[in-house]
Design a protein with these regions (language model features):
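Bacterial Sec-dependent N-terminal signal peptides
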Residues: 1-27, 242-244
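Residues that define the transmembrane beta-barrel architecture of outer-membrane proteins
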Residues: 25-27, 59-61, 105-109, 158-164, ...
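Residues on the lipid-exposed face of transmembrane beta-strands in outer-membrane beta-barrel proteins
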Residues: 31-35, 65-69, 111-115, 128-130, ...
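Repeated loop/turn-to-beta-strand initiation elements of outer-membrane beta-barrel proteins
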Residues: 40-45, 74-79, 120-124, 176-180, ...
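Flexible, solvent-exposed coil segments and beta strand-coil junctions
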Residues: 42-48, 84-95, 144-151, 181-185, ...
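Outer-membrane beta-barrel translocator/channel fold
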Residues: 52-54, 58-60, 70, 74-136, ...
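Outer-membrane beta-barrel transmembrane domain signature
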Residues: 123, 127-215, 223
Length: 244
């Protein structure tokens, strides 16, 4: 029995190691500002940078602006617009031609509701976010895969994507401590494909309240079935927020 358990454990470790070699590693960093206009109503701005390909390549830049309203003590609504400038990796077409990497703009809108409940020092929250992303059409350079000679530009058709992102999160309030650890799981459902799961994210992180106006966020994230504008696999993240 012990031998069987050992072999089963060894198989799991080998499988995980092989999978880890296939996964990418990305770095996500962000800087944001939040302002309370009046009671229960906030506005926010955020800029973000993401890398991919084992941290060696720029993945995307983005900027967002949003508003949030606290409906009750346990329910909050928010909406935002995000402009994404995505670095599309090079690819080979079905005919063997080469399309070098190119920058691609995307427009994203979302509306979300977040409900929370506290139990002792734990706080559990459920966030449901409807998200729509539109990729405008554009023409990109294309070259012959054999001799590298220029070909007629490739036309990339515009495309929209509707998803529902469901995130369950737990935070823990440590007595007399400026650090707040959290863990979450998020599922992304494709609304254009009968709710099929497009992506799963697992996150472990900690929020660090430096002062009344300054805060940091550090986290590790793993995701599978990632879409094209995000690293598939492991992500290390850091964010800074200024509240005034």
């Amino acid at each position: 029995m012990n031998k069987k358990l050992f072999l089963a454990g060894l198989f799991c470790l080998v499988s995980f190691a092989l999978q880890a070699q296939k996964d990418d590693l990305g770095l996500w960093t962000s800087v944001g500002m939040e302002k309370r206009l009046f009671r229960d109503f906030d506005i926010s701005l955020e800029g973000e940078f993401r890398s991919r390909d084992k941290l060696s390549e720029v993945g995307r830049w983005s900027g967002s602006a949003g508003v949030a309203y606290k409906i009750t003590n346990w329910l909050k609504a928010a909406t935002a617009y995000t402009y994404i400038f995505y670095n599309h990796p090079s690819e080979i077409t079905n005919k063997g031609n080469v399309i070098p990497e190119y920058w691609q703009p995307k427009h994203r809108f979302y509306f979300q509701l977040t409900g929370k409940v506290s139990l002792n020092r734990f706080t559990f929250s459920l966030r449901e976010r409807w998200q729509y992303t539109y990729r405008p059409s554009q023409s990109v350079s294309k070259f012959d895969g054999d001799d590298g000679s220029p070909k007629d530009d490739e036309y990339v058709k515009g495309k929209g994507k509707n998803v529902l992102r469901s995130r369950l999160q737990a935070t823990y309030n440590i007595p007399k401590c400026s650090l707040t650890p959290y863990a979450s799981c998020e599922l992304t459902h494709l609304l254009n494909d009968k709710g099929a799961i497009d992506k799963t994210r697992w996150t472990l992180g900690v929020e660090w309240k430096l002062s009344k106006h300054h805060g940091l966020d550090f986290y590790y994230l793993y995701q599978n079935h990632a879409d094209e504008d995000e690293a598939n696999g492991h992500v290390i993240g850091a964010g800074y927020t200024f509240k005034f």
